[in-house]
Amino acid sequence: GEFRLRIEDTDTERSKQEYTDAILASMRWLGLDWDGELTYQTQRTDRYNEVIDKMIESGHAYWCSCTPEEVEAMREAARAKGEKPRYDGRCRERGLDAGPGRVVRLKIPTEGRVVFDDMVKGHIATDVSELDDMILRRSDGMPTYNMAVVVDDHDMGITHVIRGDDHVSNTPKQILIYQALGWELPVFGHVPMILGKDRQKLSKRHGARSVVEYQNDGLLPHALVNCLVRLGWSHGDQELFSMQELIDLFDGKNLNSSASAFDPDKLLWFNAHYLRETPLDDLARLVLPFIQQKGFTDATEASIEPLVPLYRERAKNLIELADGIAQLLYKSADLPYDEAGVAKWLTDEGKEY
């Protein structure tokens, strides 16, 4: 199979190049290499509009002139009646053309259910009364998330969509778009979100950090990959996997159906293991930048490699390993003394030493 990477950047307010650069750098550091060229959604707006225009022509989509304020009033009225807040479809049969401030909506069926077999959660059915005529193209001409990903997945030949279960509610909407276009559905799988040790939604207070922060904290990339894999997938009782083993053994049937808790201590356990397993020359290369940050700018991989075995058995990350090696370097270095400090703190007897 292929692993394709797509940058979903249609939300221009939340999408910046530095964010994309950080994502790509983090994936490369983790060894998560993708196949083919990167796909940027902002470079495909003509394609999305082509598909949306065809949906309008076929009667599966329509122009809507309702303002956001009018739509909110519809929803408030529905809430007041104890009904599900939704757009009431008043523009469905008006036959409007394009115009300033107008959006394009999907004309969903008026009755029936959307059903699919999730590879993790099993059979899922949603009554169309729970949905409304979702927007496909915003008033600024940009496609919505659900519209863009359906076109992308179809054009990129995506066969399996595996994502967090916070996207389960999007899937019926996307299936309706697939059906309107007459396209074959991919297989959907929704994995549970990772929780903290207290079984609450994972946050920074649980130790969740960005990939760059873990890298700066002296974590090895494969330790992080191994730890994350075990939170969402299993192969018997096996804990440790090489990257090739993960590729060879992965089977969607073994995706966890219940949420797992992230344990920072377990991550350090993985990291300590891979520190001990990493060849000495590779470990010297990895720890060198952390040693140089401590002021030993003349240190080289060759000069510190003999010192690595002295501390790696007890270190949990590269920072701890660098701290241990630095102690030896401090002792062997010809460090200058602060003359003012010597005069202030050392007695005449001490100066003799």
What are the language-model segments listed below?
Residues 1-81, 170-183, 223:
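N-terminal Rossmann-like or analogous alpha/beta NTP/dinucleotide-binding catalytic cores
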Residues 7, 108, 350-352:
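Hydrophobic residues in beta-strands and at strand termini
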Residues 21, 31, 136, 151, ...:
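Conserved nucleotide- and phosphate/pyrophosphate-binding catalytic cores
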Residues 62-190, 195-202, 210, 235:
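Active-site cores that bind ATP or allylic diphosphates and position pyrophosphate for catalysis
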Residues 12, 41-44, 109, 164-167, ...:
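Short beta->alpha junction loops/turns
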Residues 9-11, 155, 162, 274:
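A generic structural motif
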